[in-house]
Amino acid sequence: MPELPEVEVVRRGLQDHVVGKTMTAVRVHHPRAVRRHEAGPADLTARLLGARISGTDRRGKYLWLTLDAGAPTTGRDDPDAALVVHLGMSGQMLLGGVPRAEHVRISAVLDDGTVLSFADQRTFGGWQLADLVSVDGSVVPAPVAHLARDPLDPLFDVDSVIKVLRGKHSEVKRRLLDQQVVSGIGNIYADEALWRAKVHGARVAATLTRRQLGAVLDAAADVMREALAKGGTSFDSLYVNVNGQSGYFDRSLDAYGREGEHCRRCGAVMRREKFMNRSSFYCPRCQPRPRR
């Protein structure tokens, strides 16, 4: 699943190419892609038609296009709605040529002739229109309002998150994946952050010191910035940027996917174990497993 860096790469691509453009045609090719839009495909296409894209934004793994959606019918120019995009496991926001037809779920033609396509092989992602609401001093779409800030958010409060984590009597990795504690971190970057901080993901969050938790959160921010600079992490063709290009941070991973390889820090053999229906990768020497 795309995590924060991958979603931010897509957002930046959209920011450069679609802001200021108006949707002149919209077509839903597969109803599952708009299942979160309760009013249905016809309502979504009708409301998007003529809407001007005024900006792009993101929180955690969600991105959205702010729209002057009221302009065609009310004459207002203020952004009052958002097109929320969740990439799910394999969603792609692509510009230009249409990708393989069987995977295109939604397409929109912009007033300069650009085609914006949402392709999704596994159909877990989708689009929905939502009202914008004010939460913690930020304006976000209503479906995103429950998410915590992410480590790359300028208003991310490390001390507050540490306080929340120290009150949790469950594994620290479980809490890092909790999008209501800190958003944007998924399995890959959780493992990378824990490896950098020399903390095993099975450690109970409440038993870690403030310094240890701060090191984990700082590492998460650092590794995601590095991944962002390299276009994100791509293990297959399911994650690409708006031009259909893969990221290459997978070559720089220190923990995730490295079972049986030597730890780049101490030389021990990296291990994998099951965790929350996922796999966790760690160094048994740098990140000793807690005693039960």
Curated annotation (Swiss-Prot):
Keyword Cell membrane in annotation: no
Q: How does it assemble?
A: Monomer.
What would be an example GO MF term here? zinc ion binding
Name a Pfam family for this protein: H2TH
Q: What is this protein called?
A: Formamidopyrimidine-DNA glycosylase
Q: Which GO terms describe its biological process?
A: base-excision repair
Known NCBIfam families for this protein? fpg, PRK01103.1
According to the lineage, what is the superkingdom? Bacteria
Q: So what EC number does this one have?
A: 3.2.2.23, 4.2.99.18
User: Zinc finger regions (FPG-type), where?
Assistant: 254-288
Co-factor note (free text): Binds 1 zinc ion per subunit.
Query: What PROSITE patterns does UniProt report for this protein, alphabetically?
Result: FPG_CAT, ZF_FPG_1, ZF_FPG_2
The UniProt gene name for this protein comes to mutM
Instruction: Write out the entry's keywords from A to Z.
Output: DNA damage, DNA repair, DNA-binding, Glycosidase, Hydrolase, Lyase, Metal-binding, Multifunctional enzyme, Zinc, Zinc-finger
The record ties this protein, via HAMAP family, to:
Fapy_DNA_glycosyl
Which Gene3D superfamilies is this protein grouped with?
1.10.8.50, MutM-like, N-terminal (3.20.190.10)
- Reactions accelerated catalytically: Hydrolysis of DNA containing ring-opened 7-methylguanine residues, releasing 2,6-diamino-4-hydroxy-5-(N-methyl)formamidopyrimidine; 2'-deoxyribonucleotide-(2'-deoxyribose 5'-phosphate)-2'-deoxyribonucleotide-DNA = a 3'-end 2'-deoxyribonucleotide-(2,3-dehydro-2,3-deoxyribose 5'-phosphate)-DNA + a 5'-end 5'-phospho-2'-deoxyribonucleoside-DNA + H(+)
Q: Which InterPro entries match?
A: DNA_glyclase/AP_lyase_DNA-bd, DNA_glyclase_Znf_dom_DNA_BS, Formamido-pyr_DNA_Glyclase, FPG_cat, MutM-like_N-ter, Ribosomal_uS13-like_H2TH, Znf_DNA_glyclase/AP_lyase, Znf_FPG/IleRS
Active site, UniProt feature: P2 (schiff-base intermediate with dna), E3 (proton donor), K61 (proton donor), R278 (proton donor)
Family per record: Belongs to the FPG family.
Source organism phylogeny? Bacteria, Bacillati, Actinomycetota, Actinomycetes, Mycobacteriales
